[in-house]
Design a protein with these regions (language model features):
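Transmembrane alpha-helix interface/packing and boundary motifs in multi-pass membrane proteins
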Residues: 18-23, 109-121, 152-158, 262-267, ...
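Hydrophobic transmembrane alpha-helices of multi-pass solute/ion transporters
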Residues: 1-78, 82-102, 238-247, 255-318, ...
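Re-entrant/interfacial helical elements at transmembrane boundaries that shape
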Residues: 123-134, 164-176, 335, 368-382, ...
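Hydrophobic alpha-helical transmembrane segments of multi-pass integral membrane proteins
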Residues: 71-73, 99-131, 340-383, 404
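Central hydrophobic cores of alpha-helical transmembrane segments
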Residues: 125-132, 150, 273-283, 354
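Juxtamembrane helix-boundary/capping and inter-helix hinge elements in multi-pass membrane proteins
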Residues: 45, 61-62, 140-144, 169-182, ...
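Juxtamembrane and boundary regions of transmembrane helices in multi-pass small-molecule transporters
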Residues: 22, 159-160, 171-237, 370, ...
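Alpha-helical transmembrane segments of multi-pass membrane proteins
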Residues: 101-113, 140-159, 348-361, 387-417, ...
Length: 495
């Protein structure tokens, strides 16, 4: 009987997952699943409506700071895209000239840096795909390697960027500061970027590709008009960035991104980092002529706030409500018991949390759906089953947040039916109709995805993460499974 009650309590998760798999937006699926969770909690635990509302509101209160971060993040993304920060980053790299042997690795690095500035992998891919695919066409590079490289690079900033919605949401669900997340995984993320770049460069040179030089202007001029029109429909902001790249913006417009990174490295609060980016993009943009007036710049801020409030903030409020109700009735206890029956130590538990993220991503076919569905489960698995100091427990929550984000974003690149891949294929067919792309084209050459997903799981399980600065998990006996603690006490009593 206990099994069936536990399964019934967990059924709201199945409903949320099923609705999202069917294609329903999370903004609709989450409220429906939440109402169902209210009903289940009332039946199984005899909880009153007011009690459920109170626990739901209390859970959402913890996300208030996250909501402000999301608004500022969207505002900074708008300002960076419109004032020329993104275009300056692209031009700095492209004006050096490219060959068939370097187009893939340069595309990888440019999209990696640009995605940090814009906070969006989809927007970065849409903006850079026309440039690098037509550059690749001109110099005679390998189209599949270049495509997969910019796909992997575009995911870099979506996993570690201050203004990435997946970074902010995954951190909020685990109740960790975004800036702490970035600092804890920074060396690992940059290490993955460097290792992947080296591998891509080696692959390019092993293909015996030509060494003729081309530039971005030629590539953009080569893009057919109908392609630009199709891209405007798919991602209008990408067309604006392409035009800025073609017309040129001063190189110093990249300084706002540098300032944001420097402030972040200093460890200042996330809101201050984002504010520095917004203000500096206005000041430098005014000097460069990319900002027409204070009024027009404030319109960008308004657009950013509106974008955050129209979906992601409302979605997170419902997800927070859902998580509060599920926790109130101990809905995750059966899953916790199943995982704990297999985990022999904290590292194995954390490794299984990573596997849960991958499984959720594959099942839901959406990285944000995985983050909001699996995130509360992995958080409760740690909080209910691990003992340690507040500092050590915080480090475990940081890894859970990194799992949710990294295995959501990079994991998506290895799942053929994922919405990420579907979006990429749509962009590719629009901007480069000379090749018929399929999902495996992106997957088999996506070096960054393989390196990131494989390394974080292996490092977590083996304990080799201790060799990466700030990335190591606390070891036993500093953190211990509660069941192991009980077993040790029982053994001492017997002795």
């Amino acid at each position: 009987m206990g099994f069936w009650i536990g399964l019934f309590k967990f059924s709201p998760v199945f409903m949320l997952a099923g609705l999202m798999i069917s294609g329903m937006d999370c903004l609709i699926a989450a409220p429906i699943a939440t109402v169902y969770a209210f009903i289940v909690a009332a039946i199984t635990d005899k909880l009153k409506f007011n009690d459920l509302v109170e626990c739901a509101v209390d859970n959402v209160k913890h996300l208030n700071l996250v909501f402000f971060i999301l608004m500022f993040a969207y505002a900074m993304a708008e300002s960076f895209m419109s004032t020329g920060v993104g275009a300056a980053i692209v031009n700095i790299a492209l004006n050096l000239g490219l060959t068939a042997r370097t187009v893939a690795v340069v595309g990888f690095l440019v999209t990696g840096i640009l995605s940090v500035a814009t906070g969006t992998s989809w927007g970065t891919f849409a903006a850079c795909a026309p440039i690098f695919l037509w550059l690749n066409h001109i110099v005679g590079g390998n189209i599949l390697l270049t495509t997969a490289s910019i796909a992997g690079g575009a995911c870099f900033g979506d996993n570690i960027g201050l203004i990435s919605d997946t970074t902010v949401v995954s951190s909020g669900i685990q109740n960790v500061e975004v800036i702490d997340r970035i600092r804890s995984q920074g060396f690992w993320s940059v290490g993955c970027l460097i290792v992947s770049a080296i591998i891509i460069f080696i692959i390019s040179n092993s293909m015996g590709l030509p060494t003729d030089v081309a530039n971005a202007g030629l590539a953009i001029d080569a893009i057919p008009t109908e392609v630009m029109e199709a891209l405007a429909v798919e991602r209008a902001s990408a067309v604006d960035l392409l035009n800025q790249v073609k017309e040129g913006v001063p190189y110093y417009m990249a300084i706002p991104l540098v300032l944001v990174l420097l402030v972040a490295i200093k460890g200042l609060p996330t809101l201050i980092c984002l504010s520095v980016g917004i203000v500096s993009s206005f000041l430098f943009g005014s000097f460069a002529g990319t900002v027409e007036s204070l009024s027009s710049f404030l319109d960008l801020i308004y657009t950013g706030f509106e974008g955050a409030g129209s979906w992601v903030i409302v979605m997170m409020m419902w997800v927070g409500t859902f998580g509060g109700v599920m926790s109130k009735m101990n809905a995750f206890k059966p899953l916790s018991n199943a995982v704990m029956s297999l985990a022999k130590n904290v590292r194995q538990l954390m490794f299984m949390n990573g596997l849960l993220c991958i499984a959720g991503n594959a099942a839901l076919s959406d990285e944000m759906a995985q983050i909001v569905t699996v995130g509360p489960i992995t958080r409760e698995l740690v909080e209910e089953n691990v003992e340690g100091s507040e500092e050590d427990m915080y480090k475990l929550r940081l890894r859970n947040a990194t799992f949710s984000d990294a295995l959501g974003v990079f994991g998506s690149q290895l799942i053929p039916w994922h919405v990420y891949i579907g979006f990429y294929l749509g962009i590719l067919s629009a901007v480069y109709p000379l090749h018929q792309f399929v999902a495996l084209d992106i997957i088999k050459y996506n070096v960054m995805a393989f390196v990131a997903v494989g390394s974080i799981l292996i490092l977590t399980l083996t304990g080799w993460d201790r060799f990466i600065p700030k990335f190591g998990l606390p070891s036993e006996p500093h953190v211990r499974l509660k069941k192991k603690q009980k077993q040790d006490k029982k053994s001492n009593v017997t002795a």
